[in-house]
Swiss-Prot record:
This is Methylglyoxal reductase YeaE. It is an enzyme of class 1 (oxidoreductase). GO terms for molecular function: oxidoreductase activity. It catalyses: hydroxyacetone + NADP(+) = methylglyoxal + NADPH + H(+); a primary alcohol + NADP(+) = an aldehyde + NADPH + H(+). Induction: Expression is not significantly altered upon methylglyoxal addition.
Amino acid sequence: MQQKMIQFSGDVSLPAVGQGTWYMGEDASQRKTEVAALRAGIELGLTLIDTAEMYADGGAEKVVGEALTGLREKVFLVSKVYPWNAGGQKAINACEASLRRLNTDYLDLYLLHWSGSFAFEETVAAMEKLIAQGKIRRWGVSNLDYADMQELWQLPGGNQCATNQVLYHLGSRGIEYDLLPWCQQQQMPVMAYSPLAQAGRLRNGLLKNAVVNEIAHAHNISAAQVLLAWVISHQGVMAIPKAATIAHVQQNAAVLEVELSSAELAMLDKAYPAPKGKTALDMV
């Protein structure tokens, strides 16, 4: 079976599962394991790595920087800027600090982490300057809802936004009402963070759901793999789960070979229905 690929900016094709790094870099005793997991993921073809200056206050970027040693050219590297750094010289300084921690001289993609301190015009201008300086190749956004995207799209250069990274999983389908169809219409990929839901009752409910486990049994895979396969079954959607161990990253990579049938997708739809109306954008 052919692996599912996602097009970024029309010029880069990447596997529909990438590697997230939220919570990496917080525990020094886990660093070697985290680096090894990221490197294993790269070798398995999970070549997009997503990080942020926020994660572990820059610690996750340092872990990624170590993992990239000798492998930088194989990787599509994504980082994110705090809203209060996303304009003017602050954006230049923040990007340069991320590059130092990542031990690289460019990012493939730089995202506004969420909207806030700067007007979109200022953020777009800063992103364009960073591209001109060769520090980033593309820019995008995260945690922007449909109305935000309409506002961004009206600005000069706003339609150069390469992606929107949002929370999306079987138990949180709000983006399917208007945001996801609009992104698909623009042929702009959506990066799904927390594709297995955040830890706690919601995630446990998804992983223990009878329908999810029936499908897992039919494919001889785990419930978590079913949830990931569901996310990437949607046109133009990439999942970026975190895997802190090599075994976990191997399971994530295997999802690229899983194809849920239309009947199985219908069963999951019935268990966790799509929204009938507009809901506020979920974010964590």
